[in-house]
Structure formats: structure tokens, C-alpha cells
Amino acid sequence: MWCDGAKALAIIRRAERATWENPDMSTYWAMIATLLCVAGGCSRQGPPGPELATSATIKDLMDAMVDPSAEYLFENIVEIVDEKGIIDKTPKTDDEWKEVRRRALMLVEAPNLLVAPGRKVAQPGDKAEYPEVELGPEQIQKLIDDDRDAFVRRARRLQDAAVLALKAIDARDKAELFSKLGDVDKACESCHLHYWYPNDTRAREAAKEDGVVD
């Protein structure tokens, strides 16, 4: 049986003293000490803990994290052209850049939460807000469960786009940020078209024109 860490340490100390007294045994004791260090380390490792609970639903995370962060970025990383000229709404101060970065970081990490095992689409009893064009939570859940790998790939597409947007923010490269936020928008719309409103023909045609889907 493996000894615990404290016993292993005591034996290692005795091995060190024995090595001083008999240098010819140094290699032997070094091997023993190494094995005991490994054993001691292993004995301190407890069993894996329980999985974390997933109380929030995908809808909860979309409402609390993804939608507000994406909308903030789309509304504040923009140049508006009207009859008066160009209105630049991009960040200018350090505080504005920090807020933009905070929102982008939400989009980087949200996909990790969305794909967590056991995460449900919505709370029991939730209904589609516009059932004439939207799928219900049960239908969306079935689409995800039937091909979970595809759901993970779509979430990763959002994450990858958000990571590049975050890099542009850190570089304060506005042109690159405009471009990468376009990719974020496409990733969002692609996922929505597949799971949320796949039967909305007008949205799908618009998405094809914008290069969101083939």
C-alpha cells in the first residue's frame, strides 16, 4: 500500500542521511525517493468532485450575457453617416475601451457556458414569443440533443469571432474591430437560423445575401 505524503517525506529524509554515510548507494536511494514523492503526491489527490449544477438555461444566458453584450458592441462600435456627415460612436477614452473589452469578453466566455453538459434550453413552461415563426423550447432542445456536435461547433464559431474581436480591442484597431464584429454578427445569426427560426424564409434569404449561410 502506498504511504501518505508525511510518511514519504520522512523516508526521503532518512534516505538523504544514508546517502551521506554511503555515497555508493546514492543512485538507489534517489530512485526510492522519487517513487515515494510520486506516491505521496498521488495519495493527496482526492476523488473527482461532482459536476457543477447548471441552474441557468440557454435562454437565461442569452438574455443576461450574450444579447446585452452583443447589442452594446453593435451600437457603440459604429460610424453613422447622415446628411450632417459622419458620426463616430467608437470608443475614445480608456474607460470606454475598458467597457467595450468587458462586453467582448462576455462573448468570448458565454459559449463555454452555453454548451455545458446538462444545460437546458429554457425553463419548464416557457413558450416561443412568436410561435408563427419561432420554434418552441422543446423543438430547439431536440435539435441540440440530436446533433450536439453541431451545436458546439456553432457556439465555437461565435467564440472564435469574439476572440479576434477582443484582440482588435486590445490593439485598439477600429478597422479590424469593425470587421470582426461582422463575423460575430454572422455567427449569431447562423445559430439563430438553425435553432430559433429555421422556417423564416425571409430571414434565411437575407442571411444568404449577407454571407451568413450558403
Language-model region placement:
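Short, Lys/Arg-enriched N-terminal segments with co-localized hydrophobic residues
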Residues: I12-D24
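C-terminal motif of bacterial Sec signal peptides marking the signal peptidase cleavage site
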Residues: A39-G41
